[in-house]
């Protein structure tokens, strides 16, 4: 009888297969997981673009975050104590569609020294609605200041969950969503946003103010990487919902384009 071709002569199983109790292998074990598929796609797109898989091109500027605590403490010192923090802000189009086509917009917010000197906090915000349901949905936008930017998925803040968002304080005319017009708007005057949080099903609660500053002399495909899973605070972090898929996609996108370590300022 010919030898069983599914098992090598020494009785071991090839490393890409999983042995079942009867000695056979399970083909399902070789199928990529959701996180694996997301990672492969993100790495492939980032390698082709030599830019992030999503939000590939953006406008970067300095900003100032002023935290003004109100109401009950959150259980996170960064939000419970007044303070001012230097910020690097990157405004971008999500898919990178050309021209003035509607596209979801993103704000990548890097807060310096949020948990003491040398610490980093990254928040990734996407244009969304403000209602109890629409605040969780990415919304394409023609006017960059027409509505809020939220984390879409909740954060664990102290002992509770809440969504984080910035709401534009609109004092200027329509800002079209092209990179050129975004750059011009930031260059023309400081743009202000109210930083807010909302527990599930509840109203927004003010946390402070984010104000844009001078533009950075960085190319639109700036390779600085933002990662809210690596750069977080002890008592402020993304919840576990979709965390495996998102972490895998962020890491693969960095590998695909050869980005710098997101833990470096």
Regions found by a protein language model. Give the residues of each.
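Active-site-adjacent core segments of small-molecule enzymes
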Residues: 2-6, 20-265
């Amino acid at each position: 009888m010919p030898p069983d071709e599914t098992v090598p002569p020494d009785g071991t199983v090839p490393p890409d297969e999983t042995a079942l109790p009867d000695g056979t292998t399970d083909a399902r074990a070789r199928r990529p997981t959701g996180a694996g598929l997301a990672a492969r796609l993100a790495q492939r797109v980032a390698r082709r673009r030599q830019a992030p898989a999503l939000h590939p091109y953006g406008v970067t500027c300095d900003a100032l975050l002023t935290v003004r605590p109100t109401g009950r403490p959150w259980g996170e010192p960064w939000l419970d104590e007044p303070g001012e923090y230097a910020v690097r802000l990157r405004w971008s189009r999500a898919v990178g569609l050309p021209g003035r086509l509607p596209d979801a917009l993103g704000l990548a917010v890097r807060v310096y020294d949020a948990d003491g000197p040398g610490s980093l906090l990254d928040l990734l915000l996407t244009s969304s609605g403000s209602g109890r349901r629409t605040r969780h949905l990415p919304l394409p936008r023609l006017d960059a200041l027409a509505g809020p930017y939220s984390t879409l998925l909740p954060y664990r803040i102290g002992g509770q969950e809440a969504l984080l968002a910035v709401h534009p304080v609109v004092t200027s005319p329509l800002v079209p969503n092209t990179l050129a017009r975004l750059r011009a708007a930031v260059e023309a005057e400081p743009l202000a946003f109210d930083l807010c949080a909302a527990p599930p099903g509840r109203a927004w609660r003010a946390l402070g103010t984010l104000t844009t500053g001078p533009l950075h002399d960085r190319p639109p495909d700036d390779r600085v990487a933002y990662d809210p899973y690596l750069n977080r605070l002890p008592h402020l972090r993304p919840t576990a919902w979709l965390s495996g898929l998102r972490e895998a996609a962020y890491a693969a996108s960095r590998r695909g384009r050869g980005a710098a370590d997101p833990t470096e300022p």
